[in-house]
């Protein structure tokens, strides 16, 4: 604690003082609430809603509303909120993060702000990390809200759209972060307003907020469809990758070494940089790849795909590990969440990495996907009017919460003092010695019937320890991504006397570990960490599983100098010191230098990871601004707005653009190129050919005016072909939806390509981020122009007798199997396919060489 904190208290202490009087007020209302009958207590909800309509604010109602929920929870669940839980509730209502230690009843705390904010009728989302917790909390805590007359919903992965819509319409909805994000993206791909499932994003209370907003912030949510690319190249590159030899480099290639012209010697065919998770081919490796594929120069643009795929294959073999990063189950590669140890069904690595791993594991290589819609959690949760979070561990990441999400972290005191003892780390020279020591510690605790929870980072380690304990005859349970179905049950029994549980990372987070009498007497739950995680926060979460609500317990981490953290980020000098001391086998090393080296390494990685996430956000911010514009425009179409004015603006913009592009002010009118003007404008707006005679003696602005009038008149003639004006209005909406979706998806793809290639700009002494923004905006402008041109071309060429339904829009996205919206037959254009166009059947051949040939034949 620094001098200022000693004098004035920490930020949390100062904030808690401010709300003390509010908490006192809530507690003083207790007798008043106790005196009410169930019916009268329930009637309070109607009273509060009326008072809101009369002009009172949520803050005015807070003391009474909280006192109401407190009394309702006591009657329905037999649980009354402690004073510290009331404090937590106020912090959450204020849109901040409440750091509450494990076992302090975060789930019960959420009922307070959820009830208060639900009174506005705009919806409250309580966000959990998995379906099990969403369902459990909705059933358990939902009883309190239902008792008070509010509706409670839960959205689960298995639900159809109609069910989801009903659940989101409830006052309070329990839902996982993944379902929320994917529903948001899917809502921006629907073709009828009636198919939307979500309401506006109003207020979110995020449970395990650090897991959602920090750990998962590096993985964007992606909805994808299949692209037409063949998967053969992945298999071929996998064969080659197995033949290439890993080498070493004498230094790191950086911008500085390139400028200084420093020589770096490399051995082998490729170099792996484990710190930054990058693989590079050496000169020797490049020659081998060129010989293998019979190509002259791997760096040529036409060989970009080979280059990309061989790097992917090498990454799959050297940086992605089975039972650590992914598991293979039922002939499928499934990603394991590195922070929770849980399988992430439905998620696939993007950019072809997943296919490279499938080729490595000899399972069916599924076609590479094309991104249809994507968003990061950072940008998604920032869309809420107000958001709050709860977790046991957030203070170490306070800066990130404040900078990126605008939320400060308030540490809530525990209800009872923590009685857990956190022992110094036990460090050994090798992993082998470390695991022996872990088994000994488990054995010792097991003999006195003390329950033990062993935390591992990888599935591999959990299985190795399991084998070692079996040899010692110690009965135990293993909890990792392979057995996640039994997760909650295994965790719930982990605190019983004599039980030994091995779990990867924080599997089972959110399920309380309760002690029985026997385990209390034996010293409470003993936590053993087998490796330090990259983040101190994850280590603290593991420790926090023990010592809940003042229970006894102890925790200790067992490390070795061979652990990844020490190997990659620890100082080599330090390693050499201990090696030169000649530590005997199985002897524990204890040294202040060592403890501070571990702490430094973790801080270094945390800073590094924060940098990666901040960088990702800065790039995604560009996508986000563009996404907002497109989704807003799309929603206008969906809401059934009359698009006539928008179409007329497109017509005038297109004419302006064409005239500005072809006719220059600096050139004499005699030199204006009529042929070019006709070839630019007439494919979009089928005007009569423009001749020099037509515009004789006119200035450029007069030409614009004349062409605009002709184009508008032509469109009015098209309108007159339709018996009812609404037929054309609906047609405009259909075509706009289809074109926006098509162009936006292509744009997402182009942005991906731009993002991957932008790093090379750094070598050209230009700031990659600035370049990315400039190019992205140029691309966006081109996309908007393309949307306008394609929309007009289709509308001007539409024929009344063609009947095609709005469902054709869904074929663009390949999603939307929902049939809950109304279906009206409308007129629609059918795009002509020319002989040299790609064949619509998706074969990748030209139309004349595929289906076109069949028609001719």
What are these regions (language model features)?
Residues 1-582, 631-632, 649, 653, ...:
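Conserved P-loop NTPase motor core
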Residues 110, 438, 824-826, 834:
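Active-site-adjacent structural elements in folded domains
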Residues 254-260, 472, 823-832, 850:
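Intrinsically disordered, compositionally biased charged tails
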Residues 326-334, 340-348, 549-550, 557, ...:
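Extended, charged helical/alpha-beta scaffold domains that provide interaction surfaces
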Residues 449-462, 639-641, 692-696, 840:
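Short, Lys/Glu-rich amphipathic helical modules
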Residues 454, 502, 744, 780, ...:
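Hydrophobic, well-ordered secondary-structure elements that form the walls
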Residues 829-848, 852:
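Short Cys/His-rich zinc-binding micro-motifs
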